[in-house]
Amino acid sequence: MSTVATSPGLSSFFSGKPLRFIAASILLVNGLFPAIWILFTSLKTEAELTVKPITWFPHAPTLANYMQAFSDQPLHLFLFNSFMVALLSTALTILISVLAAYALARLNLKYRALILSLIIAVSTFPLVTLLVPLFEIMRALNLLNSWTALILPYTVLSLPVCTLMLVSFFESIPRDLENAAMIDGCTRIGALFKVVVPLCAPGVFTAGILAFVNAWDEFLLALSFNSNPALRTLPVGIQLYQGEFAFPWPVISAALVVGIVPVAILIVIFQERVVSGLTAGGLKG
């Protein structure tokens, strides 16, 4: 049986920091390049965008595209609708997922494994397969053309992932802490929200961010369930900037940047909690 010798330098390269740095750099560039390109495009004029050869950086940056984005369409209204729908669906998602995850983590349920398996299975359903059933439900309940028609489906779609994430966090909290709180007079629900949830804050914040971003970015349901111009969300509103034969990419890019900024700010503010929540969830899971 023969062995192939490898040089110490090559072995240290593939197992050490250089390879990890290169891989991280590739992932970073792959993730940031589209956003940076959109930002540069939003600062260019239409003439500069179509010139050849392509210019990477805007020669004379302008904010005219941003002003036009707000004047051509009610971008502020799109932002408000998206924010309210995302905020309300996130709050509802966190409330239900906290209660569901706590029950799965603490109660001796007979079919716990089956329930967890069903949650995982539901989370894999493609959204397009749920479109018609959800539409029929919303129409039967007379909820079309309302925020509720989006808030409820967004909550349902985010619940599986958020619940599974929080189950692992709740299982890591010693039961003695809850028992001590209940001895001091807390109810079980009181112990949950006063003791367990604060200790699982990174996981709760991470689940909230995921639910918020999912609702903020969603397009298909927002387009299908709402035909009221006053209730359009940002993804649906942005498509209105393009005409039948015209695609004002600088203006569209400006609207996209405006839509990215709130989510970026949210992630920057809570980045430590999100990172700790993702890493802790991965270790506990």
Swiss-Prot record:
Function: Part of the ABC transporter complex SmoEFGH involved in sulfoquinovosyl glycerol (SQGro) uptake. Responsible for the translocation of the substrate across the membrane.
Transmembrane segments: 21-41, 83-103, 115-135, 150-170, 195-215, 250-270
Gene: smoH
GO cellular component assignments: plasma membrane
Gene3D superfamilies in alphabetical order: MetI-like
Protein's UniProt name: Sulfoquinovosyl glycerol transport system permease protein SmoH
Organism annotation: Agrobacterium fabrum (strain C58 / ATCC 33970) (Agrobacterium tumefaciens (strain C58))
Family assignment from sequence similarity: Belongs to the binding-protein-dependent transport system permease family.
Quaternary structure (record): The complex is probably composed of two ATP-binding proteins (SmoE), two transmembrane proteins (SmoG and SmoH) and a solute-binding protein (SmoF).
Domain ABC transmembrane type-1 as annotated: residue spans: 79-270
Biological processes per GO annotation: transmembrane transport
Places the protein is found: Cell inner membrane
